[in-house]
């Protein structure tokens, strides 16, 4: 049996590798659920907690990006900069790893919600007063009541 040329063997290797990579991509696209599908599979309690803490996670991500920008602008080594404690250093092991204080975040969120409700009720009160004044001005001069 004649031996195949070297380029033919390498072509088979690249073809097989391409098939494996292509199969992996196709399986990844078809099998992996979307974010909405994952959230819909959660239990109602976990879904409610997920929705409740969504803004907190976004705030933490925003804070982390600020720290990363500050750290990248610094000339110090990465393990010596930033407010995040390293778990490898003894004196920093027990530091809080939270980037955003959850209680403070929820408290300020509730305060903002209360302020919005108060402003809405004040605006509604002003609207009622305006309507009453308009109604009073529209009364006829010949009516006594």
UniProtKB/Swiss-Prot annotation:
- Function noted in UniProt: Essential for the assembly of ubiquinol-cytochrome c reductase. It has a direct effect on the correct occurrence of the Rieske protein, core 4, core 5 and apocytochrome b.
Per the record, the major location class is: mitochondrion
Could you say which protein family the record assigns here?
A: Belongs to the CBP4 family.
Residue runs in coiled coils: 107-132
Subcellular location, record wording = Mitochondrion inner membrane
Give the way it sits in the membrane.
Single-pass membrane protein
Q: Does the keyword Iron apply?
A: no
Gene Ontology BP terms = mitochondrial respiratory chain complex III assembly
Show the Pfam families listed in the entry. Answer: CBP4 (PF07960)
**Name used for this protein in its record:** Assembly factor CBP4
**Cellular component per GO, a single term:** mitochondrial inner membrane
The UniProt keywords, alphabetically, are: Chaperone, Coiled coil, Membrane, Mitochondrion, Mitochondrion inner membrane, Transmembrane, Transmembrane helix
Residue ranges spanning the membrane: these are: 10-28
Give the organism the record lists. Lodderomyces elongisporus (strain ATCC 11503 / CBS 2605 / JCM 1781 / NBRC 1676 / NRRL YB-4239) (Yeast)
């Amino acid at each position: 049996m004649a031996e195949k040329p070297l380029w033919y063997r390498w072509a088979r290797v690249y073809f097989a590798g391409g098939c494996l990579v292509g199969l992996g991509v196709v399986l990844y696209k078809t099998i992996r659920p979307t974010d909405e599908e994952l959230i819909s599979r959660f239990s109602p309690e976990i879904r409610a907690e997920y929705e409740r803490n969504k803004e907190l996670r976004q705030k933490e991500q925003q804070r982390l990006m600020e720290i990363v920008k500050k750290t990248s602008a610094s000339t110090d080594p990465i393990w010596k900069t930033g407010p995040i404690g390293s778990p490898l250093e003894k004196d920093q092991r027990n530091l809080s790893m939270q980037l955003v204080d959850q209680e403070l975040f929820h408290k300020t969120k509730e305060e903002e919600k209360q302020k919005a409700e108060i402003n809405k009720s004040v605006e509604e009160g002003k609207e009622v007063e305006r309507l009453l004044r308009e109604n009073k001005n529209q009364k006829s001069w010949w009516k006594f009541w």
